[in-house]
């Protein structure tokens, strides 16, 4: 699932879970 995060998430995390929400979410 994705959790709120202030920092950018990794490209791999975005591809797997965060979709277009990389700015505020990360995979965990």
Curated annotation (Swiss-Prot):
Expressed by the venom duct. The modification 4-hydroxyproline is found at residue 4. The keyword Coiled coil does not apply. The modification 4-carboxyglutamate is found at residues 13, 16. It is found in: Secreted. One of its GO terms (cellular component) is extracellular region. This is Gamma-conotoxin-like de7a. Disulfide bonds join 2-18, 9-22, 17-27. Belongs to the conotoxin O1 superfamily. Keywords: Amidation, Disulfide bond, Gamma-carboxyglutamic acid, Hydroxylation, Ion channel impairing toxin, Knottin, Neurotoxin, Secreted, Toxin. It comes from the Eukaryota. The modification Serine amide is found at residue 28. It comes from Conasprella delessertii (Sozon's cone). The presence of a 'disulfide through disulfide knot' structurally defines this protein as a knottin. Gamma-conotoxins may act on voltage-gated non-specific cation pacemaker channels (HCN). GO terms for molecular function: ion channel regulator activity; toxin activity.
């Amino acid at each position: 699932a994705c959790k709120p995060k202030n920092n950018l998430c990794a490209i791999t995390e975005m591809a797997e879970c965060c979709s277009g929400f990389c700015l505020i979410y990360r995979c965990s």
